[in-house]
Amino acid sequence: MVAGRIDGVCVRGIVGCVPEGRETVDDLARRFGEDAARKVAAATGIEERRIVAPGQCTSDLAEAAARRLLDGLGWDPASLDLLVLVTQTHDQVLPGTASLLHRRLGLRKGAAVLDITHGCSGFIYGLWTAAGLLRAAGRRALLLVGDTTSRLVDPDDRAVAPLFGDGAAAVALEQDEFAAPIAFDLGSDGAGAPYLAAESGAMRHPGRPARLFMDGTQVFAFTLREVPGSVRAALDAAGWTMESVDHLVLHQANAQMIRHLGQKLGAPAGRTVVALREVGNTSSASIPLALAGALAPSLNTASRRLLLSGFGVGWSWGSAALVVGPLALCETVVLPGRKCPAETAAPASPTS
């Protein structure tokens, strides 16, 4: 377990991005039958998911979110010292997707970039990494998270096809000596690696088709075993009580699990956020998409105490307690399905 606090770093804005394409319960009913599709929707709280168009990749969603955020804040891309990208669905083997986005967004030549391969815990790991690096050196950072998990899903697999959607988000971070500390708790257990995996591609299984496998029973047991303790550790590191938290935002895996964890943690009524009905489980992007969607009216107008927790593949988990708002920009944008992949378009010119 890694627990601690990072001082002097503030969240300035959050923009989520989802693709235009949708798959609804009605679409699933045509594939799996009406009763099966409705039962899954009732159990998970997912009625539709956003799906990327052919040719669209994680970087396209992340770029759209980043451009809107930088424009809304009035930040010159050349003012960024750091870009951290979290995804488990990279555009290609190498170079890393963060390097591709460095070029496309027009960051200055000396800016540092970093790829982190993490799934549902990835937003917390990315926030911890970006805030820590920014505190050590630099003034401004851009944290990008996103996944196109639909590309890994067998459309005929009833265990995973109704759950996963695609999405990304961009978060602007800036040094601020008056910012409240961000408290973290993180952990991993590699014994869980076989239970949520896509054993394909890369070097070990280069010819195997990319297919996501999930043992739902093991995932649920892991979540109940590790997440409550992590959330409480972050609370303790912040010096908060659960009653003092304005919003509890857990990884948006399914509605039943979220509500169960909220009750187990003793969250006051109405403070546990459930925001996956129209997007599904968007992996690393699920927490910031909830912030940029369901909580946008709250975060745009006032300062809020947020308690966040992500958990999943690895096993890995992470929780954070932080004060956010009022934000200069907090919203969600849609990437049109007709938009060409950005790598085929004219690149932005990096500044020196």
Give residue ranges: language-model regions.
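Glycine/charged-rich beta-loop-alpha catalytic/anionic-binding loops adjacent to active sites
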Residues: I46-E48, S79-V84, R103-T117, S150-D156, ...
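Phosphate/pyrophosphate-binding loops at sites that engage ATP/ADP/AMP, CoA/4′-phosphopantetheine
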Residues: A65-D81, G229-D246, A294-L299
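Acidic-glycine-rich active-site phosphate/pyrophosphate-binding loop
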Residues: G33-A42, Q92-L107, L143-T149, A198-M203, ...
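Short beta-strand segments
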Residues: R12-V15, V86, T117, A141-D147, ...
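Flexible, glycine-rich active-site loops centered on histidine and acidic residues
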Residues: A131, R135-G167
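Claisen-condensing/thiolase-fold acyl-transfer catalytic domains that form or cleave C-C bonds
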Residues: S59, E63-A66, T89-H90, R108-G110, ...
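Condensing-enzyme catalytic core mediating Claisen C-C bond formation in acyl metabolism
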Residues: M1-P54, D157-A221, R225, G229, ...
